[in-house]
Amino acid sequence: MPHPVDMVVDTGDKGDLWMDAIEAEKRGDREDSLRICRELVIGEPDNSDAWMMIARMELPAPTKGKQEMPSLVQTAKSVTALKKVVQLDPENRRAWDLGGTLLVDHLGMMEDALTWWEERREHAPAEVTPLIEQVSILVRMGYYEECADLIEEMFSPEMETVDGGLRMRMGRVSQTVSKASK
């Protein structure tokens, strides 16, 4: 068993690694930040923040405010890290949103994306976003009839209150399904 002093130093080293990763990101050195976070999760596999940084650093850096399209390899690596993030921190909405976007828009994995959002619903049953995403995916797949139950649930009183923008999106999704199913 390690000496208690060694354990304290160990914790400090991990904290130092995390600070180094943040500093590398601030400097714009994504590769160094990625390398440090990979090293960090080897010793601290339950560090959801480090996994989230890995997921972000695997993707191309935005240039002039626009996100460059990631390669399949970059996307797959990012999704793998995001799966770890949501496993460790199921309340990390940013990870859920990014993972859903990557699965649908960059990998075209519609079935996996449906499962992804269903898992989110298990953790946040009153959240509307997973339902909207599932309906949108089903519409893209042409499964309009399957959308009806989800839309009904989306507008049920048990669901969280949403802001105007999300309410408009819910209405658009509902209208799209209604028109397409006729």
Segments predicted by a language model, with ranges:
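TPR alpha-solenoid repeat register
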Residues: 50, 95, 130, 163-164
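Short coil turns that delineate tetratricopeptide repeat
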Residues: 11, 45, 90, 125, ...
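Structural signature of tandem alpha-helical TPR/SEL1-like repeats
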Residues: 27-35, 62-84, 106-119, 142-149
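TPR-adjacent "capping" and linker segments in tetratricopeptide-repeat scaffold/adaptor proteins
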Residues: 2-16
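Alpha-helical segment of the N-proximal tetratricopeptide repeat
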Residues: 13-43, 59, 63-68
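Canonical positions in the second alpha-helix
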Residues: 39-40, 84-85, 119-120, 154
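Residue-level recognition of tetratricopeptide repeat
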Residues: 22, 56, 63, 101-102, ...
